[in-house]
């Protein structure tokens, strides 16, 4: 007999994990399909999770750093390691980097949790949606992830106030961060809360290569695991390949057939669902819908699918700071800033530290490669 579920969630990042948690708490039968694996971190080990795949730390950056590489010029992605961490895609006018694993983008985000810059961002978009309504959700998430703004008492290295180049840079405030900050600054300690073991932030390795210590709050242990105690099912290494709308049948509530590749056993499988929540990220969600409609012929309609696709406005720049400080220490991304006298009211500049890179073996004078070389 074919497997059936009331709600199927595709993707376990911020969209999928939070939706799945809410539904599971309401007693709904929910299954999450995630193409990536559970990651090997202190919190996940403490929960007794099995089949953990490494983060791209140290030499693992070469074996588990990239999952696949794609381009609008290629007919097919180049898959390097299905347990790899990063998907890199070169598009026509946009480049996308996203993570793969249970918890989705929470493994590579900087831990910032901030409201939109535009005060009325949610107003006049839909009759049932407004800024006042969204504020309640912002407050709920900040409380759930125990996120708070940094203060001087946290003694974070390389804060903008400390590296403003004699006042040329102006800090624009401190957004809330979802990090386990040290109770004693400079002395990160082990903490266990609700059965989850974590280490406080060491200001050194919680960036885009993941947070092995669990200092950064990720969705696997903070959102999905608690929901699993209330009935949520999560299947890792299951990559959805197409979605098919079923013919209406009043005697059967199932409305969709979802086909996926189970990378754990190498089989193509499928499941019937009454409802499907597609939360596989901006790139993968659009790609899956296009494939389901145009290749698998499982969906119809959606005439504007793929049009107006864009990112969240990020541009990457590289400049030399000539600092006598180790700017990799501190938070993964510093608080937003602008030039002191800038008239601009919309652009934010953020200093990013690619922490953990010093543990990756690099070619050096020693010939075979020296760990820690830059």
Regions found by a protein language model. Give the residues of each.
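A short acidic Gly-Thr/Ser loop motif
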Residues: 11-13, 103, 280-283
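A short, basic/flexible loop-to-alpha-helix module at the beginning of a structural domain
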Residues: 1-4
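Conserved redox-cofactor binding core of oxidoreductases
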Residues: 63, 70-73, 91, 127-239
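N-terminal Rossmann-like FAD-binding beta1-loop-alpha1 element of flavoenzymes
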Residues: 6-32
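Short, hydrophobic alpha-helix immediately C-terminal to the catalytic nucleophile
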Residues: 17-21, 221, 225, 286-290
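FAD cofactor-binding and catalytic pocket of flavoenzymes
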Residues: 78-97, 105, 109, 127, ...
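Redox-cofactor-proximal catalytic regions of oxidoreductases
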Residues: 52-150
């Amino acid at each position: 007999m074919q497997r059936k579920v009331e709600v199927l969630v595709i993707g376990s990042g911020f969209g999928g994990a939070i939706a799945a948690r809410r539904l599971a708490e309401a007693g709904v039968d929910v299954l999450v399909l995630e193409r990536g694996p559970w990651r090997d971190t202190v919190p996940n080990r403490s929960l007794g999770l099995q089949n953990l795949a490494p983060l791209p730390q140290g030499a693992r950056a070469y074996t588990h750093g990239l999952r696949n590489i794609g381009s609008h010029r290629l007919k097919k992605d180049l898959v390097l390691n299905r347990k790899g961490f990063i998907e890199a895609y070169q598009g026509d006018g946009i480049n996308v980097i996203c993570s793969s694993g249970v918890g989705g983008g929470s493994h590579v985000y900087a831990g910032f949790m901030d409201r939109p810059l535009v005060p009325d961002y949610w107003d006049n978009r839909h009759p049932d949606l407004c800024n006042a309504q969204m504020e309640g959700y912002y407050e709920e998430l900040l409380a759930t992830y125990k996120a708070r703004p940094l203060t001087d008492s946290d003694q974070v290295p390389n804060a903008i106030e400390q590296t403003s180049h004699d006042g040329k840079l102006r800090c624009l405030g401190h957004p809330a961060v979802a990090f386990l900050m040290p109770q004693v600054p400079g002395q990160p300690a082990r903490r266990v809360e609700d059965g989850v073991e974590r280490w406080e932030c060491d200001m050194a390795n919680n960036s885009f290569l993941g947070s092995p210590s669990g200092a950064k709050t990720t969705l696997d242990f903070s959102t999905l695991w608690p929901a699993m105690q209330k009935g949520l099912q999560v299947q890792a290494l299951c990559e959805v390949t197409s979605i098919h709308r079923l013919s209406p049948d009043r005697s059967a509530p199932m409305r969709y057939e979802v086909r996926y590749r189970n990378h754990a056993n190498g089989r193509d499988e499928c499941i019937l669902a009454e409802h499907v929540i597609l939360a596989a990220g901006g790139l993968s969600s659009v790609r899956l819908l296009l494939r389901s409609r145009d290749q698998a012929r499982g969906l119809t309609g959606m005439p504007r699918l793929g049009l107006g696709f864009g990112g969240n406005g990020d541009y990457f720049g590289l400049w030399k700071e000539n600092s006598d400080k180790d700017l990799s220490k501190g938070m993964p991304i510093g608080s937003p800033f602008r030039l002191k006298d800038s008239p601009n009211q919309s652009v934010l500049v953020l200093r990013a530290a690619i922490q953990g890179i010093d543990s990756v073996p690099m070619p050096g004078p020693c010939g075979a490669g020296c760990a820690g070389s830059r």
